């Protein structure tokens, strides 16, 4: 009865009490606006009520750490042209952290119409964090949060600092004091947690309306700066600065030297076209000198995968300046067979080739000086809709006057002594010296398609410039190429930062192929770090790389103990699956998810995190050509392909593969050139908090290992905190949704690190 009376009294005297939430702190309230604040591991919804309890803004941070908070305006009437500023942070002794170390961003909202999963909900969610560069408006009765991030300089003195945030609008002003305590330790420039976030440069080019590579390089540099500020690394900082390779001694391009299906000798030349939206062809790599006054005949042996399959042999003509002569294609469409047979094309110097009163081919034009030879396994068309596989052997281009074959290497045999690979690192080195010479990035991805299958019909096997694994030619090229990369990285001090990530989420059926590729890499360049993402981590595949990266939900701590103990690195990744209640990366999820990922990583001894993309803003196959998705209006990540018909879209989840927003809010109509950086998301800012939490934990470990005899009380306290209990998480489905639990432990770690630092002086 007394409880009922108490609740009734509170509702009468304090009607807002019923709706007051249990996070955040009221700063001040008047008829114009309520001001309240919250730490930055909360998503403040538009209609969240102001908290009942009061509290001043107090934050703590190490040197070289970023720490944030949110101030929320909840107007009693609409406010316009609100300006916001912050003063320098000052100690009573006069030490100062200048205001330029504070980023002020507006928390904006995106409308989730399609929830990411069955346990997600539609609604307006906070996510984009654009810088406040001009006054803004605040709607009556709607929360309008402002996000502050303070970067503490490495040279700052420890102790308490004080600053004032000022909001101004016509007829209204509010001053908000802020207290910052700088702890007496410094975070390292390079985070202990490695990371790999994909970044699509072509997407940036499109959405920023950039005209050339120089503009793209300028904008990418701003993205990379933002990455460093967030303590994350892109997978490839050298997207526009590739390692270039040139293979020498190979005379045919586009097909495969097939050792398993031959007419004579060691090889035939297989050309395979498996695509319905592009044409495939084999081509002699050089132009052949011809005399249009002489008769020629092309003769070859061929077979096709299917009986009566049509294939084509074409000859193009060029001037003495090696310019293509249009409308002068020569050649023949042939009917193939599953057994070898001989075909030919005759090119008369005078008379055209006529069939049923139709001119099929005319003599070489009088200005022709060169010709090229093209082998198609089907009949090429404008859309590339045909498919097929054909083999060619003993191909000859004969000058009938002299009887000489003017096409070298038409037998498709290879002199292995001629093979070589030239590597050009000049562009890569420019980027590496820019982005690896300064702290911030923890590593970079190397993709090697030479370990993947090529345009080859047959067994699933690695392919390098026309040669398949198992041939002496492949072995030689692979040895030169991979060892060349290894040695160059080692010579420049970059070895160990790379991870060779060439295959993604292999299925069990692919394990033999994956093992072969990893063995090639280890045999040719044993110092390179091999990497794999694993949807089903297990003993069948875990031993073939130096780093394994399962999806977080599939990580098995018990299974992985032995491999980690042996020194194998373990990372984890988040993606479109699984949805809530698992830890996930979606906009329509609890804010704590991104931070919890790092706490779980520490508990499980994981040393890296990966997300497939950070700016997947559009899937071209899901919309009409030239129409771009506007993620400011629809934050769902769509994906084409996956066995869906053209124009259909798989829904990956809101914000999957998308942690940054383009500055262009109307990509289909706004053609302004944006030479600016990205708009970060609230989720990536919270992830940075987790990365810094992880730094705290590793630094505590280091202090524990190097503790002095008189520091055992500190050691015991540190070990207790680092033994993460079930009040934080049980597994990736059972974890606290209350950020205050993480912040409590962070507070304890910060104080301990300060004490260790003080006693080690």
Stretches found by the model and what they are:
Residues 544-644:
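Catalytic-core region of carbohydrate-active enzymes that cleave or remodel glycosidic bonds
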């Amino acid at each position: 009865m007394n409880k009922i009376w108490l609740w009734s009294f509170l509702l009468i005297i304090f009607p807002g009490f019923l709706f007051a939430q249990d996070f955040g702190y009221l700063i001040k309230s008047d008829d114009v606006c309520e001001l309240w604040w919250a730490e930055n591991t909360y998503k403040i919804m538009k209609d969240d009520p102001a908290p009942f309890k009061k509290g001043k803004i107090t934050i703590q941070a190490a040197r070289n750490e970023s720490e944030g908070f949110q101030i929320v305006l909840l107007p009693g009437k609409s406010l316009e042209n609100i300006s916001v500023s912050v003063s320098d942070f000052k100690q009573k002794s006069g030490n100062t952290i200048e205001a330029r170390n504070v980023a002020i961003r507006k928390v904006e909202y995106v409308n989730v119409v399609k929830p990411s999963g069955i346990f997600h909900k539609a609604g307006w969610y906070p996510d984009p964090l654009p810088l406040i560069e001009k006054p803004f408006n605040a709607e009556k009765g709607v929360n309008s949060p402002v996000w502050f991030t303070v970067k503490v300089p490495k040279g700052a003195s420890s102790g308490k600092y004080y600053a004032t945030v000022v909001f101004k609008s016509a007829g209204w002003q509010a001053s908000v004091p802020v207290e910052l305590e700088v702890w007496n330790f410094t975070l390292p420039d390079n985070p202990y947690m490695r990371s790999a976030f994909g970044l699509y440069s072509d997407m940036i080019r499109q959405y920023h309306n950039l005209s050339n590579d120089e503009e793209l390089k300028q904008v990418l540099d701003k993205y990379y700066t933002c990455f460093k500020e967030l303590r994350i690394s892109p997978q490839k900082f050298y997207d526009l600065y590739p390692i270039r390779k040139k293979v020498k001694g190979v005379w045919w391009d586009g097909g495969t030297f097939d050792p398993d299906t031959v007419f004579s000798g060691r090889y035939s030349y297989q050309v395979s076209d498996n695509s319905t939206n592009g044409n495939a062809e084999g081509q002699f790599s050089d132009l052949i000198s011809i005399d249009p006054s002489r008769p020629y005949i092309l003769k070859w042996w061929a077979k096709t995968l299917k009986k009566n399959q049509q294939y084509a042999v074409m000859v193009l003509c060029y001037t003495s300046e090696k310019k293509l002569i249009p409308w002068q294609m020569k050649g023949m469409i042939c009917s193939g067979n599953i057994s070898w047979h001989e075909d030919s094309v005759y090119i008369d110097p005078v008379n055209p080739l006529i069939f049923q009163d139709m001119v099929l081919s005319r003599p070489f034009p009088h200005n022709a000086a060169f010709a090229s030879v093209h082998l198609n396994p089907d009949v090429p068309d404008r859309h590339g809709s045909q498919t097929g596989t054909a083999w060619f052997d003993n191909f000859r281009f004969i000058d009938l006057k002299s009887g000489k074959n003017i096409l070298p290497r038409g037998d498709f045999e290879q002199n292995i002594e001629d093979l070589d690979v030239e590597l050009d690192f000049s562009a890569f080195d420019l980027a590496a010296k820019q982005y690896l010479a300064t702290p911030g990035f923890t590593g970079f991805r190397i993709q090697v398609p030479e370990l993947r299958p090529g345009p080859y019909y047959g067994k699933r096997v690695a392919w390098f410039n026309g040669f398949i694994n198992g041939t002496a030619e492949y072995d030689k090229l692979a040895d030169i190429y991979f060892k060349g990369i290894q040695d160059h990285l080692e010579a420049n001090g970059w070895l160990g930062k790379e991870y060779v990530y060439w295959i993604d989420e292999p299925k069990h059926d692919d394990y033999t192929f994956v093992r072969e590729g990893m063995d090639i890499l280890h045999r040719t360049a044993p110092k390179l770090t091999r990497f794999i993402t694993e949807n089903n981590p297990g003993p069948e595949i875990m031993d073939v790389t130096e780093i394994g990266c399962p999806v977080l939900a599939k990580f098995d701590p018990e299974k992985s103990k032995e491999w980690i103990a042996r020194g194998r690195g373990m990372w984890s990744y988040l993606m479109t699956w699984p949805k809530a209640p698992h830890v996930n990366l979606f906009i329509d999820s609890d804010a704590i998810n991104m931070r919890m990922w790092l706490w779980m990583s520490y508990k499980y001894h994981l040393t890296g995190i990966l997300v497939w993309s950070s700016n997947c803003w559009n899937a071209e196959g899901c919309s009409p050509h030239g129409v771009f998705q506007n993620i400011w209006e629809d934050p769902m990540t769509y994906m084409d392909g996956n066995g869906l018909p053209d124009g259909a879209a798989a829904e990956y989840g809101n914000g999957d593969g998308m942690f940054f927003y383009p500055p262009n809010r109307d990509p289909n109509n706004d053609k302004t050139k944006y030479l600016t950086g990205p708009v970060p998301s609230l989720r990536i800012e919270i992830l940075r908090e987790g990365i810094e939490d992880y730094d705290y934990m590793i630094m505590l470990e280091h202090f524990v290992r190097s503790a002095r005899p008189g520091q055992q009380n500190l050691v015991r306290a540190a070990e207790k905190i680092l033994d993460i209990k079930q009040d934080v998480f049980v597994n990736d489905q059972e974890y606290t949704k209350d950020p205050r639990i993480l912040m409590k432990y962070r507070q304890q770690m910060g104080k301990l690190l300060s004490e260790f630092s003080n006693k080690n002086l």
